[in-house]
Amino acid sequence: PYFSFKKYQVEDGLSHNTVWCALQDSYGFIWLGTSDGLNRYDGRGNKVYRNVLNEKFSLENNFVEALIEVDKNLWVGTNSGLYIYDRDTDRFSYFDKTTQYNVYISSEIKKIIKTENGLIWIATLGQGFFIYDPKTEVLTQNSVQTSFVWDLCQSADRKRVYISSLQEGLLCFDENGKFLRTYEISLDINASDSYKVNCIQNIDGDIWIGAGSNLLSRLDERTEAID
């Protein structure tokens, strides 16, 4: 197959050349989270969303690292909390739900996913991960195993969630958030970054793991072996 690529950068209207996340929504718009604003590209032009002084319905933080579409609306993860974009009003609202212990999401958000059972998982640097149930509107926090979560990934059968940690390596939970096990990624105890799992991706049923500065591993879910 033939692929054609076009570079899109600040000179073309992009708010910043550092792009952290990208999403094509159900309406065909391409959303790009950057270090200086959220961009919406429609194929012809680009609209930039940033913080507007004294405007309560704008983003309060321009550093956007995570995006997901939930019920036609956009969930926007920044480095100081979560915002919901309402498509009908073209406005943002701060996600102010709290846990039963009155904890709200205030840390840098690295990844947001929605699991098969409808739960929304939110990975943060500093507060572990949160799980939000849209049906009950209940928010729970898990920071027992690790406080610094870099990435989230579902298993091939959608029954488990893998979490990459900057402290403990690769962690596995069931779809409801129950801790199952830890996977040891590197045996090189002399490497200062040997357990820092940076990213995980499900490709054709295998979990690919990027760890440290130069390590790529593969988890076979059937045998639970890492090579």
Residue ranges and their predicted role:
Residues 1-227:
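Carboxylate-rich, polar loop motifs that coordinate divalent cations or form catalytic acidic clusters
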